[in-house]
Amino acid sequence: AFQVKDWNGDFSPWKLPAAFGDDDFKGNGPKTLQWLMNDLIPKLKADYGVDREIYLIGYSLAGLFALWTAYETDIFSAIASCSGSLWFEQWDEYVLHHQIKHESNIYLSLGGKEEKTKNPVMARVGDRTRTQERILRNDPKVKQTTLEFNSGGHFADAQKRLVKSVKWLLECT
């Protein structure tokens, strides 16, 4: 697990104005990915002798970030996007023009109430997530994928959802 200083800035793959509130998305996801690849992962390998498959799991905007990395690098062999922010502007166009870089297992999940919101930007998360699953099912680099709907809204049982994603990914190997 790792933390970032600026959630909206460090996990967003590109710049966008705020979808709600006034905290814009600064588009520093590429810098975060470079830090993972050039600093954190090599340090973990050196300090702990970790030399096996690497999974990236994220929740909310970190879930979008995790999924985005599968299109940007071949370093991760499994991805989980739990309640991923697939409502993010231009995400649907992005996935149509990019390919998954590494043979991967990819887990998607969403709360059943997440798309039932008055915010029109956030309301598209359900359709976008279902579309993402269809795209992944047809991607030759994706070994297995699933989309699991959980009860509740975005913040309901976040830890339980993350555990479910880890369990599914481990069962795929």
Language model features with spans:
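Serine-hydrolase catalytic machinery in alpha/beta-hydrolase-like enzymes
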Residues: A1-W35, D39, K43-D47
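Active-site nucleophile loop of the alpha/beta-hydrolase fold
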Residues: Q3-D6, A80-F88, G111-E114
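Short, surface-exposed alpha-helical segments at coil->helix boundaries
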Residues: P30, Q34, N38, M122-R134
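Short beta-strand immediately N-terminal to the catalytic nucleophile in serine-hydrolase-like folds
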Residues: E53-G58, C82
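Gly/Ala-rich beta-loop-alpha elbow adjacent to hydrolase catalytic centers
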Residues: I57-A62, A66
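Conserved hydrolase catalytic core segment
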Residues: W68-S77
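Flexible "cap/lid" loop of the alpha/beta hydrolase fold
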Residues: S85-E103
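C-terminal catalytic histidine-bearing segment of alpha/beta-hydrolase fold enzymes
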Residues: S109-E115, G126, R130-E133, R137-T173
